[in-house]
Amino acid sequence: DLDEGKSQVAHGETVRETANMISFMADVIGIRDDMYIGKGNKYMHEVVDAVTQGNKDGILEQKPTLVNLQCDIDHPTQAMADMLHIIHEFGGVENLKGKKIAMSWAYSPSYGKPLSVPQGIIGLMTRFGMDVVLAHPEGYEVFPEVEAVAAENAKKSGGSFTKTNNMAEAFKDADIVYPKSWAPFAAMEKRTELYGNGDTEGIKALEKELLAQN
């Protein structure tokens, strides 16, 4: 269990150096980097590129498998586990087409959760011909790039992807309701900036603001 505070990253070690050192000791590397908007997934790709290059250059005898345990864009392991459960409940993947799933924002007593779960769900479920509805209050939008992927997936699979700020509309005739809390997009951007500046007091103030907003 490593983070920037426990590794040599805190002392200026590069992504390439860290990735290669860990790779000497691991067959599988899981990375979770979900709190930095616009940076988490990018960092994971930097690690993948570094390990791939290390293997090509002969530094690493073998290239470990890298697993996205959650980033700012997606939470693939959870989304796939949820999909397997849904497939089981409806008796097979062939029975998913036309089923309506409402991915809905929900209240949570904890502050500012990442956007990756709702984004992972709308990105995956739309690939199976399902009618996917993303429901949330105004200000809780997800990445527009992910919405575009969901819309394109739905078009190809014969399903649909819609957005609404009306929860009753989203839940009407839904076969599945998936409640999940996530932070306002603007707040996630602000938190990324605060973390980057090392502003611990600003982060604490933002946490209080998000709790009140929840």
Predicted regions and their residues:
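Short, conserved loop/helix-junction motifs that constitute active-site signature segments
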Residues: L60, N95-K97, T126, K208-N214
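Glycine-rich phosphate/nucleotide-binding loop
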Residues: K180-N214
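Short, structured secondary-structure boundary patches
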Residues: H11-A26, E152-S160, K190, E201-G202
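Intrinsically disordered, low-complexity coil segments
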Residues: K6-V9, A50-T65, F90-G98, P109-L115, ...
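Charged helix-capping and loop-helix junction motifs
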Residues: E13-R16, L115-G120, L194-Y195
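Short amphipathic alpha-helical segments
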Residues: Y43, E147, E189-R191
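Glycine-rich phosphate/diphosphate-binding loop of Rossmann-like nucleotide-binding domains
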Residues: D1, I87-K180, F185
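Phosphate/diphosphate ligand-binding glycine-rich loop within oxidoreductases
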Residues: D1-I87
